């Protein structure tokens, strides 16, 4: 094999290894984060909602600690309902991977009419949650809690 071919092969392998180490993040979560920022006018970073109470973040169990945590529980339940829809029950079409069309105008969120049934349902789950987050008080004491003892 020629040295130039080996260099190209090595470069491809290195780039593939680098891409494999990037953690996958469902695309819909980016949209949901943007909706949250729209609804709360950027007053609180989205990451503050990722590990809040018993339901905000991955998973969820127990009794919500406050109104904001109830918003997350309702959002989780909404995604659960989306997964039951025939339009949303095939691979990569569920709530975490299905992107949708929406608009943000001065804090007002609108799910666009061009979304199919699954996308419209998921968009409405995210829209409702983002509005709920914006209205609910944020208690710093409920961020990054020990869910094993408090939930």
UniProtKB/Swiss-Prot annotation:
Keyword field contains Signal: yes
Tissue expression per record: Expressed by the venom gland.
Tree of life domain: Eukaryota
PROSITE patterns: PA2_ASP, PA2_HIS
Single Gene Ontology MF annotation: calcium ion binding
GO cellular component, one term: extracellular region
Active-site residues, as the UniProt record annotates them: 75, 126
Entry binding sites for Ca(2+): 55, 57, 59, 76
First and last residue of the signal peptide: 1-27
SUPFAM superfamilies: Phospholipase A2, PLA2
Disulfide pairings: 38-104, 54-151, 56-72, 71-132, 78-125, 88-118, 111-123
Catalytic activity annotation: a 1,2-diacyl-sn-glycero-3-phosphocholine + H2O = a 1-acyl-sn-glycero-3-phosphocholine + a fatty acid + H(+)
InterPro entries linked to this entry: PLipase_A2 (IPR001211), PLipase_A2_Asp_AS (IPR033112), PLipase_A2_dom (IPR016090), PLipase_A2_dom_sf (IPR036444), PLipase_A2_His_AS (IPR033113)
GO biological process terms, semicolon-separated: arachidonate secretion; fatty acid biosynthetic process; lipid catabolic process; phospholipid metabolic process; positive regulation of fibroblast proliferation
Cofactor(s) for this UniProt protein: Ca(2+)
Record keywords, A-Z: Calcium, Disulfide bond, Hydrolase, Lipid degradation, Lipid metabolism, Metal-binding, Secreted, Signal, Toxin
Cofactor annotation comment: Binds 1 Ca(2+) ion.
Gene3D superfamilies, sorted: Phospholipase A2 domain
Main EC class the enzyme belongs to: hydrolase
Family affiliation: Belongs to the phospholipase A2 family. Group I subfamily. D49 sub-subfamily.
Main function: PLA2 catalyzes the calcium-dependent hydrolysis of the 2-acyl groups in 3-sn-phosphoglycerides.
Protein name listed in UniProt: Acidic phospholipase A2 2
Lineage of the organism: Eukaryota, Metazoa, Chordata, Craniata, Vertebrata
């Amino acid at each position: 094999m020629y040295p130039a071919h080996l260099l190209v092969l090595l470069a491809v392998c290195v780039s593939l290894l680098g891409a494999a180490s990037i953690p996958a993040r469902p695309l819909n979560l980016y949209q949901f984060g943007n909706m949250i920022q729209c609804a709360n006018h950027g007053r609180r970073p989205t990451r503050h909602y990722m590990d809040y109470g018993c339901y905000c973040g991955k998973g969820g169990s127990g009794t919500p600690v406050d109104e904001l945590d109830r918003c997350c529980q309702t959002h989780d339940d909404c995604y659960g309902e989306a997964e039951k829809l025939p339009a949303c029950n095939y691979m990569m079409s569920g709530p975490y991977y299905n992107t949708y069309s929406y608009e943000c105008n001065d804090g007002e969120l609108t799910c666009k009419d061009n979304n199919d049934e699954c996308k419209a349902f998921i968009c409405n789950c995210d829209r409702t949650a983002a509005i709920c987050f914006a209205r609910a008080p944020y208690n710093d004491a409920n961020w990054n809690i020990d869910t094993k003892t408090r939930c």
